[in-house]
Design a protein with these regions (language model features):
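Acidic, Ser/Thr/Pro
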Residues: 1-186
């Protein structure tokens, strides 16, 4: 027997879907995300659909590139991240402005690559931050051609904070799209 569920069937409204201290980020296929980590924060990167590379750049607290903070080896020039940042769309502009505000230079950095074109759906990589750092995670890829079946797919990032109370008092407000021209406090 099928039962139609409605909002009246919710027994405890407003419950958190994730436990305290756990954050979920989605890196869109062909896009990137910038995340700040503290010492001993754990991050799980999940290739949800498979066959999607993950390019990572890590900057230390001084703004210098250092992938070893996540236990990764710097291998390649971050050409995919540079390509995404040079696109003429709103998300690329927003990411570039966040990097500029934090004085992070992608041009001098080396990237680390996780996953491959042969990775399976649901494949996971677990990393632990050794120190305070800012990370750029990208899911690189080209727009799918009409005669192919290989679009860039999303990556899921699950961050487990060691000190969740540190972020409890800070409002979760997104970065502004542009610098404010006039700021008035009332």
């Amino acid at each position: 027997m099928d039962k139609n569920l409605t909002s009246m069937d919710i027994r405890n409204p407003g419950l958190r879907s994730l436990p305290p201290g756990v954050e979920r980020y989605l890196v869109k296929g062909g896009g990137l995300s910038v995340i700040s980590l503290d010492p001993d924060d754990k991050i799980e990167i999940i290739d949800t659909e498979g066959k999607q590379k993950c390019e990572i750049i890590v900057f230390n607290k001084d703004g210098k590139p250092d992938c070893s903070l996540l236990g990764l080896k710097e291998k390649d020039d971050p050409k995919n991240i540079k390509k995404i940042l040079s696109d003429k769309n709103e998300s690329a502009f927003q990411a570039a402005s966040v990097l500029k505000k934090r004085n992070l230079d992608v041009g001098k950095a080396k990237a680390s690559i996780l996953f491959s074109e042969n990775s399976e759906a649901g494949e996971k990589v677990n990393l632990v931050s050794k120190d305070k750092c800012t990370c750029i995670f990208s899911a690189p890829g080209n727009a799918m051609k009409v005669d192919e079946q290989n679009p860039p797919t999303d990556l899921l990032l699950m961050v487990k904070r060691t000190k969740p109370q540190k972020y409890k008092d800070k409002p979760n407000i997104p970065e502004p799209l542009v610098d404010p021209l006039n700021e008035i406090f009332v």
